[in-house]
Amino acid sequence: MKILVQKFGGTSVGTLERIELCAKRVIKALEKGYKPVVVSSAMAGETDSLIELAKKVHPRPPEREMDTLLAVGEQKAIALFAMTLNKLGYPAVSLCGWQVPIITDNVHTKARIRKIGISRLLSLIEEGYIPVVAGFQGVTEDWEITTLGRGGSDTTAVALAAALKADCEINTDVPGVFTADPRIVPNAKKIKKISYEEMLELASLGAKVMQIRSVEFAAKYNVRIHVRSTFSEEEGTWIVPEDEVMEKVAVRGITVDTKETRFTVVRVPDKPGIAAEIFKALGDAHIVVDMIVQNVSHEGYTDMSFTVNKTDADKAEEIVKKIAQKIGAKEVVRDDKVAKISIVGIGMKSAYGVAGRMFDILARNGINIKAISTSEIKISCLIDEKYAELAVRALHEEFIEEMEEFETINGKNKE
């Protein structure tokens, strides 16, 4: 039995007409011999509307109640999707996370999937039904509803594909993964194949096509992912194991993330245990710290800077100010006007001079670097937000413009 997990994003299911378009794509997969399992996001704007509604009731709603509320968005979408398939003559059954079941840990609003029961899905498929599963949500061992965080429907889809030993098709409002955001770089190029490792870096660095945990799942369980447009029949981008990617280019893509906030703890006593105290408290609050910079010690004191996602900034500020007071630091300075620019490519493992070229390009454009972080296949620089788009365009021109193995945004090769 050849199963295909097909995930549809919020824009794809944003209207009843679009849901019918998505349903017809599912039927095409069925006609090609696949047994489809559908995963749907909430309709576009639905989650934001529910968040606004909650905040009218409570400025900081309890996370358990937020999960219960937000799960409604996907429940509405899957019911409409299943109704549409049934109307078109194809039996379908909608399933919430708890009905599958998708078992998660107990962390509300950012839950992680622990295991998935597939027996009910397989039974429905054998009986001739198309299962339509709610993305973004799960249930704890104690039957508490949880959500997986923004973009969690991608994670649901890839996790289901892993459990069912299937390929995964991500249907979205873009035609694939590009070398840069086409809204910033009009001649950005669609990537035909990209490795898990490269996609993981791009997702973690701000690329919005895939959610980071979904790529982690794919890499761990070897799930091949096809990212494509719901509104086009053209081939998208395949996310695959490294050995399937023929060309190991130095730079595969460039990302910008303006959803970062930088904190600087000024005049921190430079002694053992201080950094641990700050970052352990942030970790205990489930706040992910990204870039960290510590200045050279002067007269027994130092400055320590780090970045977090803007969604966690208020909570992080509250925590760090308390610790700063406790350890005798002078003050905590917050900067919301920063951006993280990154270049990613598996060929960077064996290429030389890439960092120097990147820093030179930024310098020639008058862009100052506030922090740097690197891995084997990426280099990230923190800069002022006002220079973000200029930096992306300049780096794209330097590293990618002349690469002929990519497809241009309009689908034509450079041959």
From Swiss-Prot:
Keyword terms, alphabetized: Amino-acid biosynthesis, ATP-binding, Diaminopimelate biosynthesis, Kinase, Lysine biosynthesis, Nucleotide-binding, Repeat, Transferase
Q: Which GO BP terms, alphabetically? A: diaminopimelate biosynthetic process; homoserine biosynthetic process; lysine biosynthetic process via diaminopimelate; threonine biosynthetic process
User: InterPro entries annotated for this entry?
Assistant: AceGlu_kinase-like_sf (IPR036393), ACT-like_dom_sf (IPR045865), ACT_Aspartokinase (IPR054352), ACT_dom (IPR002912), AKii-LysC-BS (IPR041740), Asp/Glu/Uridylate_kinase (IPR001048), Asp_kin_monofn (IPR005260), Asp_kinase (IPR001341)
The ACT domain covers 263-337, 343-415
Catalyzed chemical reaction(s): L-aspartate + ATP = 4-phospho-L-aspartate + ADP
Pfam families linked to this entry: AA_kinase (PF00696), ACT (PF01842), ACT_9 (PF22468)
Q: Name one GO cellular component term.
A: cytosol
Cite the EC number: 2.7.2.4
Superkingdom of origin: Bacteria
Question: A GO molecular-function term, please?
Answer: ATP binding
Family stated for the protein in its record:
Belongs to the aspartokinase family.
> Mind telling me what this protein is named?
Aspartokinase
- Source organism per UniProt: Aquifex aeolicus (strain VF5)
